[in-house]
Amino acid sequence: MPVKVCLIFAGGTGMNVATKLVDLGEAVHCFDTCDKNVVDVHRSVNVTLTKGTRGAGGNRKVILPLVRPQIPALMDTIPEADFYIVCYSLGGGSGSVLGPLITGQLADRKASFVSFVVGAMESTDNLGNDIDTMKTLEAIAVNKHLPIVVNYVPNTQGRSYESINDEIAEKIRKVVLLVNQNHGRLDVHDVANWVRFTDKHNYLIPQVCELHIETTRKDAENVPEAISQLSLYLDPSKEVAFGTPIYRKVGIMKVDDLDVTDDQIHFVINSVGVVEIMKTITDSKLEMTRQQSKFTQRNPIIDADDNVDEDGMVV
């Protein structure tokens, strides 16, 4: 029998978020290219490091050929599950490669999954990785004929990394609640059809899509052009249909479920949200590049008449 849910964390960001969810124990699987992000609390979860790597240094091109051949072995450590949650940074070097490669393998398994991704906004280098990783996910969606559903959290400047990790962990717990198979009127196939909506509606073009997680009907209604919608209610009398989704299902949470913290939660998937994500990333990179173009290029301090030998020594 497959387990209900498996959580996969890749790269430094994934490893950090995993520290907030170690209480989930055996359900948590962490992957990285070096041991520098491994801390004591990771001992209670599954951690696998790639062989022959010492980190990526933010360079996706360098790490890709080193880890790609190892993906089948990594996947062998991941159990069969009814639902998978993947978490990584778009802008790093390790997670932005491991995450999409694992995602592609999950698609081949015909698995149901969503990803939580962090947009790294710290530098033009990170932003370039953000763009390339999003394009990678779009290519995977097309190649695998499956929507790749992501919840995107931008790492905006001035915000602490810890607060971002907390936000992602809280959202992940809501998805874990969604797929715990403890809700009335909601079965495993309802969840699968929600996230893999092109299986049933194959006229829709598989693309990267955005997952919105809202705890009020008003906020859920404000998600534009909702494609697929799944709602949980604690009180069934509060259920009200809204929007114009192609797919909609409802689950009724149980009062005695200790994981329930909200009286309603809405999980809404759309495609147009990705347009705004890409615009934000691209505009941020252009603005940062514009500011960098103003940097002063100083004159060299070596004079033409300096005696410089073949080792660069000035004597």
Swiss-Prot record:
It catalyses: GTP + H2O = GDP + phosphate + H(+). It holds the Pfam family TubZ_C_2. InterPro entries: PhuZ_C (IPR054768), Tubulin/FtsZ_GTPase_sf (IPR036525). GO terms for cellular component: host cell cytoplasm. It comes from the Viruses. The non-hydrolyzable GTP analog GMPCPP stabilizes filaments, which never disassemble. Keywords: GTP-binding, Host cytoplasm, Hydrolase, Nucleotide-binding. GO terms for molecular function: GTP binding; GTPase activity; identical protein binding. The record marks D187, D190 as: GTP hydrolysis. Changing D259A: No visible effect on filament formation, viral capsid movement capsid filling or phage DNA rotation. It is found in: Host cytoplasm. GO terms for biological process: establishment of localization. Induction: Expressed by 1 hour post-infection (at protein level). Changing D305R: Complete loss of ability to form filaments. Its EC number is 3.6.5.-. Belongs to the FtsZ family. PhuZ subfamily. A tubulin-like GTPase that forms filaments, which are required for positioning viral DNA and capsids in the middle of the host cell for optimal replication. The motor component of a partition system which pushes phage DNA (encased by protein gp105) to the center of the bacterial host cell. Also required for movement of phage capsids to the vicinity of the viral DNA and rotation of the encased viral DNA at midcell. Forms filaments during the lytic phase, which position phage DNA at the center of the bacterial host cell. Consists of two domains: a nucleotide-binding N-terminus that hydrolyzes GTP and a C-terminus domain necessary for polymerization. The domains are bridged by a long, central helix. Interactions between the C-terminus and the following monomer drive polymerization. Homomultimer. Polymerizes in a strictly GTP-dependent manner. This is Phage tubulin-like protein.
